Structure formats: C-alpha cells, structure tokens
Amino acid sequence: MGKIHRPRRGSLAYSPRKRAKSIVPRIRKWPKDSEVRMLGFAGYKAGMTHILMIDDRPGLTKGKEIFMPVTVVEVPPLFVYGIRAYRQGYLGLETATEVWFHELNDYVKRRIKTLPKDYNEEAFQAKLGQLEDLVNDGEIVDVRLLVHTQPWLIKLKKKPEVMEYAIGGDDVKAKFDYAKEKIGKELRASEVLHEGELLDVIAVTKGKGTQGPVKRWGIKIQFHKAQRAGKGRHVGNLGPWHPTRVMWTVPQAGQMGFHHRTEFNKRLIAIGENGKLKLDEKNEIEITPKGGFPHYGIIRSDFLMIQGTIPGSFKRIIRVRPAIRPPKKKPPVERPQITYISRESKQ
C-alpha cells in the first residue's frame, strides 16, 4: 500500500484571518541602527513598472544587465508634529510624556482633536523644556517622533495619517537632540533612507471579501464521484465525531484579504524627487508612464522605487523601515546602474 501523505492546506500562522483593525499599518519592532535618523518612512502606493539594470548583487548575473520589476511609492514629505518619550515600567516601556508642536495644519485637525485651544508657542517651549529635564535626569529611556503624512500636497485627499517612528542610535540624549531639531519641520525620504538599502514593507493587503475554502485555503476540488449533489468546492470532512465540535483548524469560507502583513528585505532601488529620477548629472526622466498609473494618476512629489511587489492596493498607505533581519550576503548600499525605465502605458 502506498504511503498516505496529505499535508494540510494553508498556513495557520496567520489565523484568525480577519480584517485589519486599521488601514494604517503598525510597527511593533524596530531594528537597531547606529545612525541617528528616523527609522523608516511612509507613502502611498502608485503602481508598478519595470526597469533594466546592471546587477551589482553577488551571484551569477553580477555585472550583467537584468530585468527587474519595481513598485513606485509616492512619498510626500512627512511633518514632525510631536515627540513621545518613554520610561521603563514594570511590564515594559510606558509613555512618560508627549510634546506637540503648536502650529498644525487645518487638515491635521480633522484627525487630531485633542489639542488644547490655548496651546501656543510659550506652552510648547515650556513642555519641551520639561522633557529635556527628564532626559538629562535619566528618567527617559527612549524618544520617538510623531509624524503625519501630507496627502494634500499630491492632491490625493485631505485627511492625513498619524503615526509614530523610532529614532536610531544608542544615546537617548542624541535622540532627543535629533527630535528637538526636527519637530515642526518637514522630513523628506532622502534624509532618512539610503538608495540600495534593504527595507521591510508593512501594509494592509487588498481586500477580497468573503471567499470559499478553495480560494481562501487552497484545498482540492473534490473528484466528481465524491461530490455531494454536484458540489465539490468544500472540505469532505469537518472533523471526527469526538470532540463534538468543529475545530478552528478546519479550512472554511470567510474573510480573505485586508490583512496586516510585513514583507522583509525589499531593496530600495532609487529615490526620486518631484516625479523625476536623476540618471546622471545631465539626464533625468519622469517616472509617470504614459496616461498615468492606473487608478492613481501622476507622480507629483518624491517617490521610492522598490524592488518587486509589495502588499496593498493603489492609493493605500505604505510604511517602510530598515530591514530588521537582513541576509548575510547583502547588496551594496548604493543605487544600481539603471539603463532603462519602462514608461509605456499601463492601461
């Protein structure tokens, strides 16, 4: 008799497969970085194209021209509206205090509605001084930036996304000095990211609604003689007689897509400015294809060119951070030589 081998279909690692709580992805873990900089950035997914580049990675194709699919993420400057400080608590980090900038855009007030009406520059400077005293006294163990996006700069929408980003480095005083310098100012992607480095991409995937077990879990369609009433797109057995309940591990129909996902080690091929990519000192090229990116339009601001595909639909908020578990053989942290960028219509 042949060996019976029937591995389960689908991974249980992501159960329960339900919709994400928020369309703005969260980052729970930050990489260790010796450079004092904001650890990541955020933008909006525009679409995909492809390029030809000289491969600079170790391998058989090194030094040769290769085809590479890339995703374009538009990244208008982020605005640093606050500083959040953490102290060491009994169960981990606890928020010690926050300092918010006193002048916020009217669009931001659609999202943030807890700022006191009498909060002015004098109150802001007083709060900043109190936080500096806590840092000097050693009560603060970590300092992070509170930032918001500016989608109105690219004519996408008005209400921004609000998020928190860690700061690299080991010295808390250096982190605070960096945050104090950046609060109330704009941050561009070229200030915090390096061309050629590896990134982790965090986003909420495309939503597909309720789907059956064949598409959702990848189970086999039943042989026609085993089907019940001609229906074979279901599991043949929901489980044993005992225990007298259906186990949660049985693949069944339900929500598919709109899940919070992280994809590791995506290389940042290039960073462009104002919708254009500078190829050399004399030549630059617009990244927008003929007719614009489908369902998105024209790239007006800075953008990231990321290798391969990333989760999420067009116009969705995408967050990136430096790779938290890079491979041993990393590509060089520099832009590879790009010989061709496809600008043909994607319609």
Curated annotation (Swiss-Prot):
Region feature (Disordered): 325-347
A GO BP annotation: translation
Pfam families: Ribosomal_L3
The entry's keywords: Ribonucleoprotein, Ribosomal protein, RNA-binding, rRNA-binding
GO CC annotations on file: cytosolic large ribosomal subunit
GO molecular function: rRNA binding; structural constituent of ribosome
InterPro entries the UniProt entry points to: L3_arc_euk, Ribosomal_L3_dom_3_arc_sf, Ribosomal_uL3, Ribosomal_uL3_arc, Ribosomal_uL3_CS, Transl_B-barrel_sf
Summary of the function given for this chain in its UniProt record: One of the primary rRNA binding proteins, it binds directly near the 3'-end of the 23S rRNA, where it nucleates assembly of the 50S subunit.
Family: Belongs to the universal ribosomal protein uL3 family.
SUBUNIT field: Part of the 50S ribosomal subunit. Forms a cluster with proteins L14 and L24e.
NCBIfam families recorded: L3_arch, PRK04231.1
PANTHER family referenced in this protein's UniProt entry, alphabetically: 60S RIBOSOMAL PROTEIN L3-RELATED, LARGE RIBOSOMAL SUBUNIT PROTEIN UL3
Name of protein: Large ribosomal subunit protein uL3
Species assigned in the record: Thermococcus onnurineus (strain NA1)
Organismal lineage: Archaea, Methanobacteriati, Methanobacteriota, Thermococci, Thermococcales
